[in-house]
Curated annotation (Swiss-Prot):
Species, as recorded: Nostoc sp. (strain PCC 7120 / SAG 25.82 / UTEX 2576)
Protein name per Swiss-Prot or TrEMBL: Probable transcriptional regulatory protein all4276
Classification via HAMAP family: Transcrip_reg_TACO1
Gene Ontology molecular-function annotations: DNA binding
Keywords: Cytoplasm, DNA-binding, Transcription, Transcription regulation
Record's subcellular location: Cytoplasm
Any GO CC annotation of this UniProt entry: cytosol
Annotated family: Belongs to the TACO1 family.
NCBIfam families: PRK00110.1, PRK12378.1, YebC/PmpR family DNA-binding transcriptional regulator
Tagged with keyword 4Fe-4S: no
Family annotation (PANTHER family): TRANSCRIPTIONAL REGULATORY PROTEIN YEBC-RELATED (PTHR12532:SF6), TRANSLATIONAL ACTIVATOR OF CYTOCHROME C OXIDASE 1 (PTHR12532)
Pfam family, any one: TACO1_YebC_N
Length: 252
């Protein structure tokens, strides 16, 4: 998972930069709208909304924008947000790498067309529903920073119902659990004094496809970057494994 985790770290850093440019404001705002619409529009009683707000704040989105998105989701602001729907798309990248795309859109035809263009221009192809999703399992993931004692992390993770954890970089770990247990794990880790910087649902590949060829690596990372740059796209997950050196050279 080292290569894939490195890519996750790059994406988190990139999201902050992109948000400051205004690129991800739409994506994060839509996530808040959907969360507020799906449950109570109060973050204290809606874990999905609370985590969406935390991500927006971490990316530097102003409180006024966040409050406006909550109001839109609650139906108290105006505008047609009922048409927003969650859709999962699937496809193949260069070399047969499996790719899952989670989108939030008010026009599925537009989204599918944008995705198809992105795939075709970068050596991949958009597939049918179910073509690659069987290669992934959805899990809850807590990203924990400032981990200086792995034994304490293990004890707290087990207490919170975690299945496993992985150290991804210096003093940072990802703790995995069942989807329904994410909120409990998140709270348990915080109660034990750990700093949880992110809590999210993530698709985890059951097997990884090793990428070693530089041209394939460049095309693949360009494809993923292009997909993530689309306003309707919320998350992109793939099953590639790549050395950090190759990733750094290809992503530069």
């Amino acid at each position: 998972m080292a290569g894939h985790s490195k890519w996750a770290n790059i994406k988190r850093q990139k999201a902050v930069v992109d948000a400051k440019k205004g690129k991800t404001f739409t994506q994060l705002s839509r996530a808040i709208i959907l969360a507020a619409r799906s449950g109570v529009p109060d973050p204290s009683g809606n874990f999905q909304l609370r985590t969406a707000i935390d991500k927006a704040k971490a990316a530097g989105i102003p409180n006024d924008n966040i409050e406006r998105a909550i109001a839109k989701g609650a139906g108290t602001f105006g505008g047609d947000n009922a048409s927003l729907e969650e859709i999962r798309y699937e496809g193949y990248g260069p070399g047969g790498v499996a790719i899952l795309i989670e989108a939030l859109t008010d026009n599925r035809n537009r989204t599918a067309a944008d995705l198809r263009v992105a795939f075709s221009k970068n050596g991949g192809n958009l597939g049918e529903t179910g073509c690659v999703s069987w290669m992934f399992d959805q899990k809850g993931v807590c990203v924990v920073s400032g981990v200086v004692d792995e034994d304490q992390l293990l004890e707290a993770s087990l207490e919170g119902g975690a299945e496993s954890y992985e150290m991804t970089e210096d003093e940072t770990a990802e703790v995995f659990t069942e989807v329904a247990n994410l909120e409990i794990l998140n709270q348990t880790l915080k109660d034990q004094g750990f700093k949880v910087t992110d809590a999210e649902l993530r698709w985890i590949p059951s097997n990884h496809l090793e990428v070693t060829e530089p041209d394939q690596a460049r095309s693949l990372l360009k494809l993923i970057d292009t997909l993530e740059g689309l306003d309707d796209v919320q998350n992109v997950t793939s099953n590639f494994e790549m050395s950090e050196n190759l990733m750094a050279v290809s992503f530069a």
